[in-house]
UniProtKB/Swiss-Prot annotation:
PROSITE patterns: HELICASE_ATP_BIND_1, HELICASE_CTER, Q_MOTIF. It is found in: Nucleus, Nucleolus. Residues 406-613 form the Helicase C-terminal domain. ATP-binding RNA helicase involved in the biogenesis of 60S ribosomal subunits and is required for the normal formation of 25S and 5.8S rRNAs. This is ATP-dependent RNA helicase DBP7.
């Protein structure tokens, strides 16, 4: 049989598409939208849906102008929709096609603080006002000539409560004193008047500048020293033989040495400069010193003057010759009287008291006086410091992106009133400079010129380049009758003094706004300050009390506003503020949107247009103007970067006891940079600062984390703040 039986077998070969589909059935598709993944999966499995032929109206040709836009047209449409946020398209956008974030989106809402209802408003009697139903100054034991000068020339009709307690004690006894009183209660006159009274009573040998130095008053800041010196000069008008003097950092030591050689009876000084003169000025004779007064003792310790004050007291003790001249100056104390004034009684103040005071008597408005003497080595019952009863404290919780525009709205509202004085506190000098430039764009300076025909001295407005004073400018961004001043420790002493003098000077036709750091928060008696704004939160609750103490002084009314961020900072209200503001109704929470609406609404606030959101368009336009100004001016942009980084460094220096409310790690740095008009990312801003920093070459090799760098520089700032010449 033949092997080949011609049997044919037919095998059907599988279709290539089905083989591919079977291989791809188990292929997992990932990424993209679900709809796209599903379509791809079906295609791999060979289950593509057959497209139905178009019928009906879809076959009718459409005019080109009415044609539905395809995907490319849609992209173009989206680009046009964002035209107002791009610098190259539209008038309100970013430069170089950069995207500008919106002010009113992605803002963190407030967690639990609700705006306070204003239906029930309580008013309280002033807690630091002069006692009108009490005795006059002559009744406190002051001599008649000095009392008449106070009432007739200085218009001080009645003493305050702290003056009623301190003046008789300093006149009748020779005990050391610790005085604790609210800020703005009249502590300066409380210790100055008894010293003048004693010096004026010395009749046997009339005291003049050649008699010697009898009193030294130490202050933590130059501004406070200058103010006390001004008070002494007004008192000398009733007794010209008493000569005051002043030595402070920032002045020429050669001029101070010349004044000390001529002689003075009462010397006001900052600790660093006084210690320098005690070592190097031989003509400064402290052998007859009868009074040593330390004003704002808590701030003296906070600035690190403990060792300096210890050196000063040791020098005074070693050179004292009071016993040798006791018979000559019989009307003066037979021993040196030390006095410490402070608004708080913390451990650092107690430590300073143990260094300076010996068996002191404690005088406080809350507790009158402590019988006998008080030992600072023992535990003293501390009373919580509080704000004046007549002061209204407002709290505004503002998202970080809206901080700058909310400040502008608040200042716009204030500038619409009659002439008022307002103080705005910032955390650092770089922030003061930046915000000063923002609000004084296109502003002018005041310059005194003499009329050639009449010889009359007039004040005229000139361009900023025509005058050397950099401390003030008009603010056309707010109103035509508003002047903004700036004050911080980095300015020259001449600028600081002239700025403060101009701000205090009466001028009823202008609103005056002072941008400053905490250098203006201690002891300064700035008259008629109606509003205090804490744009940056205080570093301690004591700093808060001193800041708001610039308003509501000597029984006058006052308003204060504190800016906080949403989140943990809201806990600062219940954790700290309610203790400092115990009066019901004095602590109020305000809605930032109402402030924006009042500041940027045009016409009637309650009109339909403003309710529909016109005000937020005006607010956005104003903020974008600031951003474009920074993009066009490189110097101003660099200043904004410095202000932002300095603000973060300052924020990191809050005390550990208040770190639960102010944690730098929880800040939204991008949103915060927006409030400085910056469009770069915080990482890029950190790099720009790093390029200008003075690192060693070894450290430049490794890239430093921006957050660690800010914390490191914050520690450096705290360390350098202990020097009075940097304050």
């Amino acid at each position: 049989m033949d092997d080949d039986d011609e049997l044919l077998l037919n095998f059907a070969a599988p279709d290539t598409s089905s083989v591919a589909a079977s291989k791809n059935q188990n292929v997992k598709v990932s990424g993209g939208r679900w709809k796209d993944r599903r379509k791809l999966q079906l295609a791999l499995q060979g289950r593509t849906k057959k497209r139905q032929p178009e019928t009906g109206v879809n076959l009718i040709p459409v005019d080109e102008s009415k044609r539905k836009r395809d995907s490319e047209d849609k992209v173009q449409l989206d680009s046009n929709k964002r035209s107002k946020f791009t610098e190259s398209k539209g008038e309100n956008g970013g430069k170089g096609d950069s995207y500008v974030s919106s002010l009113f989106t992605n803002n963190q809402p407030t967690s639990h603080l609700a705006p306070t209802s204003t239906t029930k408003e309580l008013t309280y009697l002033p807690s630091n006002a002069p006692m009108k139903d009490a005795t006059n100054f002559s009744g406190l034991g002051l001599n008649e000539k000095l009392s008449i000068h106070l009432t007739d020339h200085l218009r001080f009709m009645h003493p305050t409560k702290i003056q009623q307690l301190v003046i008789p004690s300093l006149i009748s006894t020779e005990n050391d004193l610790f005085v604790k009183a609210q800020t703005g209660s009249g502590k300066t006159l409380a210790f100055v008047l008894p010293i003048f009274h004693k010096l004026m009573r010395e009749n046997k040998f009339k005291i003049n500048r050649e008699s010697g130095l009898f009193a030294i008053i130490l202050t933590p800041t130059r501004e406070l020293a200058t103010q006390i010196y001004g008070v002494l000069e007004t008192l000398t008008r009733c007794h010209h033989w008493i000569v005051p003097g002043i030595v402070i950092g920032g002045e020429k030591k050669k001029s101070e040495k010349a004044r000390l050689r001529k002689g003075c009876n009462i010397l006001v000084a900052t600790p660093g400069r006084l210690a320098d003169h005690l070592e190097n000025t031989k003509t400064l004779d402290i052998s007859q010193l009868r009074w040593l007064v330390l004003d704002e003792g808590d701030k003296l310790m906070e600035l690190g003057f403990e060792d300096t004050i210890a050196q000063i007291t040791a020098k005074i003790d070693s050179n004292s010759k009071i016993a040798d001249t006791a018979e000559k100056w019989q009307g003066l104390p037979s021993r040196r009287i030390n006095m410490l004034c402070s608004a708080t009684l913390h451990s650092n103040v107690k430590k300073l008291g143990s260094i300076v005071l010996k068996d002191p008597e404690m005088i406080s408005v809350e507790t009158a006086s402590v019988a006998g003497t008080v030992s600072f080595d023992e535990t003293i019952a501390t009373t919580t410091s509080t704000a004046p009863d007549q002061l209204i404290q407002n709290v505004v919780v503002v998202p970080p992106k809206l901080r700058l525009v909310t400040l502008d709205a608040l200042l716009l509202k204030i500038s619409k009133h009659s002439a008022e004085r307002t103080i705005v506190f910032f955390s650092c000098s770089d922030s003061v400079d930046f915000h000063f430039d923002v609000f004084t764009r296109d502003g002018k300076k005041f310059k005194k010129v003499t009329d050639e025909e009449t010889g009359e001295v007039k004040t005229v407005l000139v361009s900023p380049e025509d005058d050397e004073n950099d401390g003030l400018l008009t603010a056309p961004q707010l109103s035509d009758n508003t002047i903004i001043y700036k004050l911080h420790g980095s300015l020259s002493q001449q600028t600081r003094a002239s700025t403060l003098q101009s701000f205090v000077k009466d001028n009823n036709s202008y609103n005056k706004i002072l941008f400053c750091t905490d250098v203006a928060s201690r002891g300064l008696d700035l008259p008629n300050v109606a509003n205090v704004i804490e744009y940056d939160p205080p570093f301690t609750i004591d700093d808060h009390l001193h800041r708001i103490g610039r308003s509501a002084r000597l029984g006058n009314e006052g308003n204060a506003t504190l800016f906080l961020l949403p989140g943990i900072e809201e806990g600062y209200v219940d954790g700290k503020l309610r203790v400092a503001h115990p009066r019901e109704g004095n602590l109020r929470v305000k809605n930032y949107e109402k402030i924006l609406q009042e500041g940027f609404a045009q016409g009637n606030i309650k009109s339909k247009d403003n309710k529909l959101g016109k005000w937020d368009i005006h607010a956005t336009t104003w903020h974008l103007d600031v951003e474009r100004w920074l993009l066009e001016d490189q110097a101003s942009h660099d200043e904004a970067v410095r202000a932002f980084t300095s603000h973060i460094r300052a924020y990191a220096t809050h005390l550990s006891s208040e770190r639960e409310f102010f944690n730098v790690k929880l800040l939204h740095l991008g949103h915060l940079a927006k409030s400085f008009g910056l469009r770069e990312t915080p990482k890029k801003l950190g790099k720009s600062v790093g390029n200008n920093s003075n690192y060693s070459e070894s450290k430049k090799g490794k890239k430093e984390d921006p957050r660690k760098k800010m914390l490191r520089m914050a520690k450096m700032a705290v360390k350098s703040a202990s020097s009075e010449f940097n304050y």
